[in-house]
From Swiss-Prot:
PROSITE patterns: RIBOSOMAL_L27. InterPro entries: Ribosomal_bL27, Ribosomal_bL27_CS. This is Large ribosomal subunit protein bL27. The keyword 4Fe-4S does not apply. It comes from Tolumonas auensis (strain DSM 9187 / NBRC 110442 / TA 4). Belongs to the bacterial ribosomal protein bL27 family.
């Protein structure tokens, strides 16, 4: 009698939910205080003037104004600032 042994189940087939990271408001846009500017893992962008940093490294506006992205310092770090209106 010919028999075929049952195949094992795959150990793949899982994936995590996407975290929707990235820049939420771009340079030149007007924002209100408290608006989220960047969601990130680690400090890809650093907080500049009128910008706060949450415990998960989310950058948010602490004042109403216009967003400005700039690269500065010896390590060419990217900073996000708010120019108050």
């Amino acid at each position: 009698m010919a028999h075929k042994k049952a195949g094992g189940s795959s150990r793949n087939g899982r994936d995590s939910e996407s975290k929707r990271l990235g820049v939420k408001r771009f340079g030149g846009e007007s924002v209100l205080a408290g608006s989220i500017i960047v969601r990130q893992r680690g400090t890809k962008f650093h907080a500049g003037v009128n910008v706060g940093c949450g415990k998960d490294h989310t950058l948010f506006a602490t004042a109403t104004g216009t967003i400005k992205f700039e690269v500065k310092g010896p390590n060419n770090r990217k900073f996000v600032s708010i120019v108050a209106e």
